[in-house]
Amino acid sequence: MGKYFSDAVDNAIEAIYYTYDREKAAAAVQPLADAANAGDGDAAYILSRCVSGPQYSWDYHPFQANDEAVEQLIRQSIVKGSAMGVLGAMRCGMLTPEMEEAMPFANLREAWNVVYEKAQAGCLFAMNMIGNTYFWLDIVRVEGKGPNDFPSKEAFGVWLRESELKCLPWFEKAFAGGMGFAGRNMYNLYNDGEEGVIAPDKSKAEAIARLGAEKGYPDWQERYAGFLISKEGRAQEALDLYFAAAKQGQLSSWFYIGKAFQEGKVVPKDCPQAMKCYELGLQDPNAIGCANRAGELLFHGKDGVPQDYARAVQFFEQAHAQKNTWGNDMLGTCYLFGYGCQKNPARALQLFQEVDYSTNLLNFGLGTLYTEGLGVPEDIKKGVEYFQKCKNYAPAQEALLKFK
């Protein structure tokens, strides 16, 4: 038996929530599954979190979301007597009356007390769970209280506010104790504030990020670097933190490192190195920024990066598939002129019309489409107006000579 739960559960919580190690997290899954199959309800609950999506653990753990498995595992955890499973089900809206009836606890308070006692005993994961029952006000359901239990609506509101703020000491203990994940809701509460509960306090939010960075949590190193990058004289410190985070597997940090090499403000400009950083970031297929910036370097093909329109199209399409239009002017230009892809004026027009920005490439592309009637009825006047919007752009100036 482990310190707080079974060995399999304690070891899994350690690997998944107290470290940022993909291999350790992956290795914890099979022992969890074996324990769950043997009737360990807590193991089933931790497994359910693994397949619930990145919002339930570190973004870069090697888990795949599976909604069907989540429901099955949550149900299994409750039936097998997991108090964590009960609180987790309540938090994600899965604690139906049927599920509540199936739990081997007299009431929700009894289940809450089990987790609370483990939090009191020092379990960081349990501390975070108790903090969340206050933060999300699940404690209202646990306590079984409502407006009619108070002398006035105002008194009920005061109780709600006081209850929500009780989350902070629990989050603070878990975060400082080694659970980087526990800082998320605490940070959001200070950074964004909540009307009627707490005013935004950016300095406290920054302090949380700084503490996380000092403790070596890669996601918090990245977040704190975001505070430092705009502060005078601290850009190099920010870049060092991005490097530290990236080396621990925080793939999103490669975007900021690549951007630093591409822009050459903090370090000497080195676009080939920037390209390498973006490609490292693209180990995460959802890395929109890296896809766009890599596409930009390949589209222009300068500063040491060979021009490669076909790869540029691939990267821009990857970003566009996630509803991002940052590179639409370049992607549309590729489709308009057949750079690295088949010519497709209709697709180019669609891409140009999706954006809310204005660039020379965009205006030149629209000017070309309208003056040549490509994919749209020819409209010389409209096309010329687009050419005229271009600023110091030789292709547009050359095109205008045809319409004097």
PLM features per residue range, with description:
Residues 1-27, 42:
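N-terminal leader/linker segments that initiate helical-solenoid repeat arrays
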Residues 4, 38-41, 54-55, 59-60, ...:
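Short helix-capping/linker turns of helical repeat alpha-solenoids
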Residues 14-15, 46-58, 88-98, 129-141, ...:
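Hydrophobic face of amphipathic alpha-helices that form TPR/SEL1-like repeat modules
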Residues 32-35, 77, 118, 174, ...:
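Alpha-helical solenoid scaffolds that mediate protein-protein interactions
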Residues 71, 75-78, 378-395:
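TPR/TPR-like (Sel1-like) alpha-helical repeat modules
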